C-alpha cells in the first residue's frame, strides 16, 4: 500500500496548527482523565522545601539510554561469547564481522566504561519491562507497571495514572532542584502532522507530539523540562522538542542538544545553591540510524557498514556528552557529591549491529533476558566499593536508593516494589534485595529475527527507495501475553502464543535446556509467585490487552 505516513500539507502554517491543536487537546483533556490528579497513594504533609536542610545532600542523576543492549558494555565474558554471537541474525544493513562489532561497541563507550569500573556493576540487573513506556514508568514510580495497569506501551498511551507518585516529587518537596532532559514517554499525547522529510522518512519526523497538561513533566515533580514527550524523536530537525510547555527548535544533533541542556541544569543548581535531581534520558541508539552523527563522533568508526557506523556513533555521542557533564561537575565543585544511576530502558532490537544483547536470548519487547537484562550500574565516587554486584536487582530500586542516599524518608503509604540497595552496597547486608522479579507483557516478535523482512523493507522506505510502507504482522497489539518470573537461580517463562512453559538456569543465556519436567516443585513455587503478583496488580488499562491478560490468568489457574 502507499505510505500511510504521507501527509497533505495544509495551507495554514504548522505553528498555527500546533497552537490550535494543543489548545483543543488541552481543553478536552480533563474530560478524558480516568484518575484524578489527587494523590491517593501517598499522603504528603503540609510543608515547603525551605523546611528541609539540603546542605551536603548528594546530587542525583538518573541516566538512561534507549534500546542499548546488555552486550554493548562488557559486563561479563559470557555476554561477549563470539561463537554464539557470530551466528546471530541481523538486518542486512548492519552486517559486519563479530570482531569488528565488539571492537566498535567498546570504542563507543570509554566514559561509561570508566564510570562502570569506578562504581558498582549490577551484573544481574533488570528493568521492569521490555519496552520503553512501562519501563520508564517503573523507574519513576519504584513500582512494577502492572501495579497500575500498564502491561505494554498501549496501556501507557493514556499516560501513567496521575495517582502514582513520581520520584522527583519527593526530591522537589525536600528542597532539590529537579529537571528532566530528553525522552519522557509517560504522558497522554496528541499529534499534529508536519511536512515529510525529503531525505529520510524517519517516523519520528512525521508529527509534532505533545503532552496533555496533566501529564506534563512539570506537573509530575520537575521544575524544568527540555525534551520530547513521545516514544522517540529524530536525531536532526526534530519537530517535537519542548522547553517546559513551549515548542523549541532543534539545534544540530539531538544528543548534543540534550547534553547542553543537562549542563545548563547543573549550572542552574550551582547558581541556586541547591542539590539537583536530574533525569537525563538520551534517545540514542533508538532506531532508525540512517543519518550519520556529526563528524567528531562518526570518524571514530569504520566497520564497513555506514548504518552500523551511524549506530555506534550515536552511542559515542552520548558517552562524550556524559564526559562533558562530568567535566562541568568538576568545574562547579559538584563532582564528588554526585550519584549516577545508569540503565538502558530495555534490551536492544534486531534492527541494529552486534553485539546487541550479547549471547542472551531475546530482544526488546520480550521477557527473555535479552529484553529486560540491561547494562546497569551505580557510581558514587568514594562512597561505594567498586566491583560487581551479582544478586538480582531491578531498575525499580533506583527510586528508593536515590531517596535513601539523600536521607529522604519514603512515605509510609507508598507501596514500592523497589528497595534501597545501599544496605547491600555500603553496609554489606546479607541476603539479596529481591527473592523474585516478575514480568507480564505482550510477547511480541516486532524486534526479533522473525521480523527481519519488515526491517529490511522499512529501511528502503525510510531512504525513499520505496513508497510502500511495509506491513508489520508483529506489533504489540497483535501479540499474545507471556510471563516470566526470575529468582537468583532460575527463570520460568510461559508464552500463550505456543502454550510453552520453560524453566532455565540463569546461566543458560540462550535458554536451551528446559528443566521444567525435571523440577515440578520449582515450577509450582514460581507459578505461585506469578499468581500473587497478579492478585496484587491491576488489570490492563487498554481494552486490547484485557483478553490477553485473562488468558494468562486462565493458564495459571489450569496449572494448579
From Swiss-Prot:
<dbReference type="InterPro" id="IPR050738">
    <property type="entry name" value="Sulfatase"/>
</dbReference>
<keyword id="KW-0732">Signal</keyword>
<feature type="signal peptide">
    <location>
        <begin position="1"/>
        <end position="29"/>
    </location>
</feature>
<feature type="modified residue" description="3-oxoalanine (Ser)">
    <location>
        <position position="132"/>
    </location>
</feature>
<feature type="binding site" description="via 3-oxoalanine">
    <location>
        <position position="132"/>
    </location>
    <ligand>
        <name>Ca(2+)</name>
    </ligand>
</feature>
<feature type="binding site">
    <location>
        <position position="346"/>
    </location>
    <ligand>
        <name>Ca(2+)</name>
    </ligand>
</feature>
<dbReference type="GO" id="GO:0046872">
    <property type="term" value="F:metal ion binding"/>
</dbReference>
<feature type="binding site">
    <location>
        <position position="67"/>
    </location>
    <ligand>
        <name>Ca(2+)</name>
    </ligand>
</feature>
<keyword id="KW-0479">Metal-binding</keyword>
<feature type="active site" description="Nucleophile">
    <location>
        <position position="132"/>
    </location>
</feature>
<keyword id="KW-0378">Hydrolase</keyword>
<dbReference type="InterPro" id="IPR000917">
    <property type="entry name" value="Sulfatase_N"/>
</dbReference>
<feature type="active site">
    <location>
        <position position="185"/>
    </location>
</feature>
<comment type="similarity">
    <text>Belongs to the sulfatase family.</text>
</comment>
<feature type="binding site">
    <location>
        <position position="345"/>
    </location>
    <ligand>
        <name>Ca(2+)</name>
    </ligand>
</feature>
<protein>
    <recommendedName>
        <fullName>Uncharacterized sulfatase YdeN</fullName>
        <ecNumber>3.1.6.-</ecNumber>
    </recommendedName>
</protein>
<feature type="binding site">
    <location>
        <position position="66"/>
    </location>
    <ligand>
        <name>Ca(2+)</name>
    </ligand>
</feature>
<dbReference type="InterPro" id="IPR017850">
    <property type="entry name" value="Alkaline_phosphatase_core_sf"/>
</dbReference>
<dbReference type="GO" id="GO:0004065">
    <property type="term" value="F:arylsulfatase activity"/>
</dbReference>
<dbReference type="InterPro" id="IPR024607">
    <property type="entry name" value="Sulfatase_CS"/>
</dbReference>
<dbReference type="Pfam" id="PF00884">
    <property type="entry name" value="Sulfatase"/>
</dbReference>
<keyword id="KW-0106">Calcium</keyword>
<dbReference type="GO" id="GO:0030288">
    <property type="term" value="C:outer membrane-bounded periplasmic space"/>
</dbReference>
